[in-house]
Amino acid sequence: LSTEFAILICGAVLVIYTMSGGMWSVTMTDVIHFFVLVGGFSLAVPFVLHNVGGWESVVTKLPPEQLGFTKVGWKTIIGLVIMYFMTFSTGQESVQRYFAAKNERTAVLGSIICGIIMALFAFVPAVLGLVALAEFPGIEANNAVATVALNLMPPVMAGFVMAAVVSATLSSGAGDLLGAATVFTKDIVEHHFGKSLTDAQLTRYSRLCVLFLGIIAIIISLVSKAIIPMLV
């Protein structure tokens, strides 16, 4: 399966369920994504460590400084904490969930639980990354998880891990896509033409916006395999 074909399949699935069900479908698929993501990566760790001879084997193959929590430097650590604290908590994929909660208490409780889970789960892909560095020196960071899964895990488990990676992408992509369509519909279309449009018409505009933005996102993904350099 080529990268381009995989992009087309994932992009089409993302656009279809976001456009057809809106916030409801995004939320329901997020529940599935959560279990696939957490389950896939969590199951991967014991399989991978067993196949490389245990954690002690990984440690002996890595320089001591590679295992330190402050290897990148405190300046970078503090900068990343501030950046992610400000962006993750205010991003569309988070804000949508806050406003979709049944009340303020649920929104606060949900965000706290999410933060705890993310803090604990952060160690799982880090372990896989260290295994990749120990077993495949010089490997590119973007290929670490895929390389470990395909070379150190049974085919079924490797497929589960790759599905977890795709789940993370789809979860963020659906929220961002729906957020952009909502901003366009509420702040532009409804603001200027709201009095003359019915709810059904606004919904139609929102779905068309999801489709249009989804197509643009797919095209960008096919043209450029890295989005961050395009933003800076």
Question: Model-derived features: where do they sit?
Answer:
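Membrane-embedded helix-loop-helix hairpins and adjacent transmembrane boundary segments
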Residues: L1-V232
